[in-house]
Amino acid sequence: LIKEFPCTPIHNNTFSFADAPPDFRRKLLDRSIFISEKSFSESWFSYYRSLKQRNSILKNNRISSIYTWNTKLSDEGIKLTNMRKNFFKKTKNEFYYLIDLIQPNSVFDFFNLIEIDFFQGWDEKKNLNDLLTHNQDIDLKRKSTTQGPHKSDIKFLINNIDARQILSRGE
């Protein structure tokens, strides 16, 4: 039934979407994709299993096996990120389409000032596998993986400034 009629639950914390921590926005995005994309759950579970293994290696300082997990984490992370990006792009386009429909005679003009962007969790210009290898010393010190899809976020900007710094919570 849920595959035929996809929906995203809205609850009392949803109003604070822009103000909530990144993991809240990731979870809401992931739930929506899970409903609409058959292969998403497999990629999601595979990525987070690989992340857990890599973080265990970092915590226990067993570097000899980290390269295998870097590759697995990177491969699954790219799949996961591509699904998130595609879904986000479609949702964003639909959002702006709806705003354009209601905007001509309403108070929704301020929505045109807001830019909604997806941050994938690492520099888009860099290869994730290379980045994991390059940041290995930093990750070892922190005993966890510092970049990847588990750090992705949806950002709300007004004139390239984080909307949370400009708007009040009610706005």
Question: Can you describe what each PLM-predicted range is?
Answer:
Residues N60, S64-E171:
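Conserved NTPase motor "head" modules and their coupling/switch loops across ABC/AAA+ ATPases, GTPases
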